[in-house]
Amino acid sequence: MVSVLSRARSLTRAVSATVAVAALLATTACSSPSPDSSAGGEAPPRDRELRIAVQAQPASLDPAQLAEGQQSYIWASIFDTLLTIDNEGKVQPNAAESWSYSEDLRTLTLKLRSDLKFSGGDPVTAKDVAGTLERTRSTPGQQQSKLARVTSVSAPDDSTVVIQLSEPEPSLTNYLAQATGVIGDPDTLAAETTKLRPAGSGPYILSDATVDGTEYVLERRDDHWNSKAFPFKTVKVRVIADRTAQFNALQAGEINAGLVQPPQRKQAEAAGFTIKEVDATAALVLILADRKGELVPALADVKVRQAINMAFDREQVVKALMQGLGRPTVQVFNPNGDAYNSELEGTYDFDPEKARKLLAEAGYPDGFSMTMPSTVISGSYEPVITQALADIGIKVTWEPVPPQNTAASVSSRKYPAVLWFSGLNAAGREIGDMYTPQAFLNPFKWQDPEFDKLLQDVANEADEEAQADLYKKVSEYTVKQALNAPIAYTGTLWATAPGVEYLPKVNVLPTIRTFGVTGG
């Protein structure tokens, strides 16, 4: 393992700290970044331009097919969401100016703003919201599972939306602040054009200058109810799959905000970029999806999953591949959240010998083989993952997957395990994304009666302190049963050119709201 990590140091220029946008600074000298300008001077704050890069184009802009992550920069600009998550990570009003739950937590009522309009000028009504949610609920896609407990969505009047639940869903307001909560125009949702040019009520519209798959140009709607909260008149989102090419774009001024790696920090600061460090923005996790053993029977055995957890030298991964911008962990939950339990750290120390013994006890003395998707997430980590698992007897074959199909590689059920970056959302949201039968990261729909009861207890608990204790029990179960193999939390370093500021202090959904302007 250590020898592979030593060799892997040569790969660090290609390592991305998160699943989000990655922009590297080269080791050659770079010129000072240019401020946003027009005709040779800094533009007024309201006329500034934001230019960022993403590694993959959106697979679709259909509300029922939206993916979170880098694609959010685009769709969250086109669509309003019912609620929003601020730069401190808290759920706040947005298109819905208020919301309330019934006493039994099975009815959520939202009140819409009165000044919502689609980009074409038509008013947004509760009927539009209900229609969008009902379509998402009935359409296969990443968002469908998040509405699994919804039994109906109604609009008793133009400004009221009522969501009925079969049982409490502690993450529902969080979902409605992200892709699940977008508002589409039901009259156009079924149109083929929605995949590329959807009708939304968000603060931006896609300009005719957009070249699908290459660059998405967003122009601010000054008639939007919240236009003043978006300081950039124009936002350009370039698709640049190669991380070194992203650096070149940053250096050349083609983009004016991007991620940098720790070794380039001083160089970036010397070149005039402002650096913002955000701690624990994601968790690098080997998702052991096939816990039912449908593709790889060995993964159904807890001893095998525990052995996999012992295969990784987490300290060395952080040191060599994350260049110290991270910390080892065996948990998938946010270290600043309710579910995190520091006492669980150290459950799986690096111990290949013990891992091999566990495999033998499980009936696999000679190990086994499995195929995993090679994605924009896994690329730089593949040599380490391959060698670590080979050292305990597990042979991994990597199958290339196009960047735009990264999410589909999880839901396809073709792969027993997937290397993934978990976004460190609220505990309930992480459970909904990873562990419920409908969860995106649980494609084989694994269940366990003991775990199901624990999740139900969490959902039914209204007291926040008591619920936090239950969340910790959830984390303990996931660690002891080795449902996945978390490796490390990773942070990010944002580099912004003069005139642009990165705002969040914690991990939040990547949207245009995370950027502000500086200077007069």
Please report, for each region that a protein language model flagged, where it lies by residue:
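Alpha-helical secondary-structure segments
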Residues: T125-T132, D158-Q164, G202-P203, F232-T234, ...
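Ligand-site clamp/hinge motif
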Residues: D223-A268, K395-T397
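Detector for C-terminal structural segments
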Residues: L24, F312-A339, I377-I385, A407-G520
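N-terminal lobe/hinge region of extracytoplasmic solute-binding protein
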Residues: A53-Y101, E134, A199, A495
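Structural transition elements
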Residues: L295, R327-E361
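Aromatic- and charge-enriched surface segment that lines or borders ligand/interaction sites
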Residues: E97-P140, P156, V162, A298-L299
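Gly/Pro-rich hinge or "lid" segments in bacterial periplasmic/extracellular proteins
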Residues: A177-K228, T234
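Surface-exposed binding/hinge segments that line
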Residues: D104, K111, S145-P186
